[in-house]
Amino acid sequence: MGSSFYRSFEERHRGSVEEIKRRLSFYLPFLAGLKDIYPDGVIADIGCGRGEWLEILNENGIVNIGVDLDDGMLARAREAGLNVQKMDCLQFLQSQADQSLIALTGFHIAEHLPFEVLQQLVMHTLRVLKPGGLLILETPNPENVSVGTCSFYMDPTHNHPLPPPLLEFLPIHYGFNRAIT
């Protein structure tokens, strides 16, 4: 897929940068305690796209890094002055030291990955998180009839829907203490 296609697609069908930032702000309260415990802790955002979440983290004084493979998305993130790298999510995680991150986030990336890659992502995330660290994955909810029958398939890069019970089971199976969907 050309580097300009997916960026144009996202801008037309996902929402403006401002709208996405408004939606993602929901997750900030989950990080408050971690920021207090680890004031210099780093959050990595895989599949960072245009960097909306990274902007929110910057605005809240949270050290971060974004990782993506799409040149068009990375170009926008770099234009915004964000700290991003072009790298596969597993390569990134494998390059991180044990207990080096306070959180790993991935908004609308899980549904793009083969399930085996998602399993490895969860396993590696547990290794790189500091005690009490968080894994936050947001994905379209196929239990919503409109999402499960139509809008999920609008994105040609989606592999398969991930039902909430499956997404909740995955981190528990690989050693996380709890999971919430």
Pin down the residues of each PLM region.
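Conserved N-terminal segment of class I S-adenosyl-L-methionine
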Residues: 1-99, 103, 107, 117-122
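A short glycine-rich, Lys/Arg-flanked "PGG" loop and its adjoining helix->strand segment in the class I
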Residues: 119-134
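Conserved catalytic-core motifs of eukaryotic protein kinase domains, centered on the activation segment
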Residues: 116-117, 148
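Hydrophobic/aromatic residues located in beta-strands of well-ordered beta-sheets
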Residues: 64, 135-137
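Short alpha-helix
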Residues: 159-175
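Short, glycine-/aromatic-enriched active-site segment of Class I SAM-dependent methyltransferases
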Residues: 137-158
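Conserved S-adenosyl-L-methionine
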Residues: 176-181
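A short His-aromatic
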Residues: 111-113
